[in-house]
C-alpha cells in the first residue's frame, strides 16, 4: 500500500499537469498582487480616521485576494473547478487507455491502486486550489501590515469562525484554506469516479466544473425564490 501511494504521489507531483495548474493559479494570485495590492500601498492611510472606530489603515485582511470581493477572486471561483481536475483527476482514464491499469489488475493490486490513486488525486487537487490563495496572502503580507479584526470591522459577525478572526486573522484565513483544500479534493474525487465510466478525458475534467457551476446557480435561484416568497414581502405594498 505504502509503495503504491508513493508511486502515485511521485507521478502526480512530477507531472506537467500539476505544474500547469499551479502556474495558472499562481499567475492569478500574482496578478491580484500586482494590480490591486501594490497600488494600494501608497494609499495605506487614506481610509483611516482617528475619530471613527471602524476605520483602519490599509491591511492584509482587506487587501489580499481572499479578503474582499475583487475581479481576481471572482475569476478564481470559476476556474478553480478546472484547476483541481487538471493535475491528476483524469489519470485513471489515461492509465486505462495506456494499458497500465491492465498490468496492475493482472498482479491483483487494483484495489490498492485505487486507494493510492484517490489519495494522490485528493492531495493534488487541494494543492492546486490553495496555491493561488496562499501565494497571494504571503506576497500581500510582505507589503501591508496584518491587523486583527475587531467587532466594528467584521464583515459578518455571525459567519463561521468569526471569533478566530478576531484573535488571529492569518490563522482564520489558513483554516478556510484547509476547508478549500478538503472540498477541492472531494470534487476531484468526483471526477475520478466519473473516469471509471467515461470514454473521454475532456468529459472527466470538465463535468465536475459544469456540475458545480450549474448547481451553484440553481441554489442561488432557489434561495432568491424563497426570499421573494417571504410573507412580509408578499404583503408589502412597496
Regions found by a protein language model. Name each.
Residues 89-124:
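Helix-loop-helix units of permease transmembrane domains in multi-pass membrane transporters
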Residues 2-6, 111, 115, 170-174:
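Alpha-helical membrane-protein architecture signal
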Residues 21-26, 201-215:
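Central hydrophobic cores of alpha-helical transmembrane segments
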Residues 226-238:
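Single conserved hydrophobic/aromatic residue that forms the stacking wall/gate
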Residues 192-193, 213, 217:
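Alpha-helical transmembrane segments of multipass membrane proteins
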Residues 16-18, 109-111, 115, 200-205:
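Membrane-helix interface segments
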Residues 1-26:
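Aromatic- and glycine-rich beta-strand/loop motifs that create alpha-glucan
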Residues 25-90, 118-188, 192, 196, ...:
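Secretory targeting signals
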